[in-house]
Amino acid sequence: MKRAFIMVLDSFGIGATEDADRFGDVGSDTLGHIAEACAKGEADNGRKGPLNLPNLTRLGLVKAYEGSTGKIAAGMDGNADVIGAYAWAHELSSGKDTPSGHWEIAGVPVLFDWGYFSDHENSFPQELLDKLVKRANLPGYLGNCHSSGTVILDQFGEEHMKTGKPIFYTSADSVFQIACHEETFGLDKLYELCEIAREELTEGGYNIGRVIARPFIGDKAGNFQRTGNRHDLAVEPPAPTVLQKLVDEKQGHVVSVGKIADIYANCGITKKVKATGLDALFDATLKEMKEAGDKTIVFTNFVDFDSSWGHRRDIAGYAAGLELFDRRLPELMELVGEDDILILTADHGCDPSWTGTDHTREHIPVLIYGPKVKPGSLGHRETFADIGQTLATYFGTSPMDYGKNML
């Protein structure tokens, strides 16, 4: 029985790439800077001392980090016995966004440039805004700017509740985000508005990667909170991913846990499981792994590393999240059968010590574990697509156009 379990620690970069200067990210280092802060006692917020990730270390994380940066992460064990295969991978795609990283992991790098709304104020074309107001019968809109998701709620949340005007905003990513109150505006109405925005952006040729519904609750600035009902409307990958090939060519199964299905615009996904928060995502993943049959991929995105701690530049929160993940990792490893492979990786960096609130261009770890996987270094990989090609070889699908098999 062949099964693959892919766990994306969203934004868990392990050191700046050679082309980081193109992105203003030279010196960014998600793992390294978290470890450094922990070793100095600067991340003792409910957790304490050096970053403690013994299970990820056994799978090769510290060795992969050393390969990427030439050093051992502060306070971590560079001499631990390694029981998995490990690599550090460079991104071939032109961006450092979530769809690019995930599609490339599945064998389809994004070699075109996404469209962006680069103006920080009055970010969206008036023609687009007018169409949205007319088609969705809106009383107007708020925002129309670059912002972080929490700041914009404090800024416009109360006015939104009074007026019913949705909050439109963007970031350095290729996104059109819409924040609305779950109770006063309504979740279904928000999702419908996002569908309209997706259609208008596609028809208008804006080449925007994702429309994101950002529902929230609360009654005044300071206590607004985003809920777990986020929904991403992505464009479809430009070519069949290894997920699609497994389903089409081998009649296999691909189980999405968390936001994976949204990222791939449901292409190559046969089952969707929603969960919010690290523990809930972990529990859902374990359940799906126990039930998975032959020719199945269980694919989970642990979004909190990015959305709750990376973008919010919360070093202590990120460290605590990693330690929680690490404590639970043996539960996953116990479910890896004789012919299975477990792959732990990331889709980009989001250094919580870095300036601004955006992603960082970094190498990602590729940690592969299974009874038949030979432990040791797989070296520097030139593209995340090596993961996709490895899966294509493993499941016996037609080869991907990019990437090399690592096993």
From Swiss-Prot:
Which cysteines share a disulfide bond?
none
Q: Which InterPro entries match?
A: Alkaline_phosphatase_core_sf, DeoB, Metalloenzyme, Phosphopentomutase_DeoB_cap_sf
**Compartments, as annotated in UniProt:** Cytoplasm
Give the keywords, sorted: Cytoplasm, Isomerase, Manganese, Metal-binding
Catalyzed reactions per annotation: 2-deoxy-alpha-D-ribose 1-phosphate = 2-deoxy-D-ribose 5-phosphate; alpha-D-ribose 1-phosphate = D-ribose 5-phosphate
Query: According to the UniProt entry, what is the EC number of this protein?
Result: 5.4.2.7
Describe which pathway this protein belongs to, using the record's wording: Carbohydrate degradation; 2-deoxy-D-ribose 1-phosphate degradation; D-glyceraldehyde 3-phosphate and acetaldehyde from 2-deoxy-alpha-D-ribose 1-phosphate: step 1/2
Q: GO molecular function: any one?
A: phosphopentomutase activity
> Which Gene Ontology cellular component terms are annotated?
cytosol
Residues annotated to bind Mn(2+) 1: D10, D347, H348
Q: What is the main EC category here? A: isomerase
Q: What is the free-text note on the cofactor?
A: Binds 2 manganese ions.
Which cofactors are reported in the record for this sequence? Mn(2+)
* Gene Ontology BP term (one): nucleotide metabolic process
Residues given in the record as Mn(2+) 2 binding sites: D306, H311, H359
Record bears the keyword Methyltransferase: no
Purpose of the protein: Isomerase that catalyzes the conversion of deoxy-ribose 1-phosphate (dRib-1-P) and ribose 1-phosphate (Rib-1-P) to deoxy-ribose 5-phosphate (dRib-5-P) and ribose 5-phosphate (Rib-5-P), respectively.
List the NCBIfam families. Answer: deoB (TIGR01696), PRK05362.1 (NF003766)
Q: Which family does it belong to?
A: Belongs to the phosphopentomutase family.
Q: Protein name, please?
A: Phosphopentomutase
Q: Output the lineage of the source organism.
A: Bacteria, Pseudomonadati, Pseudomonadota, Gammaproteobacteria, Enterobacterales
Q: Which gene encodes it?
A: deoB
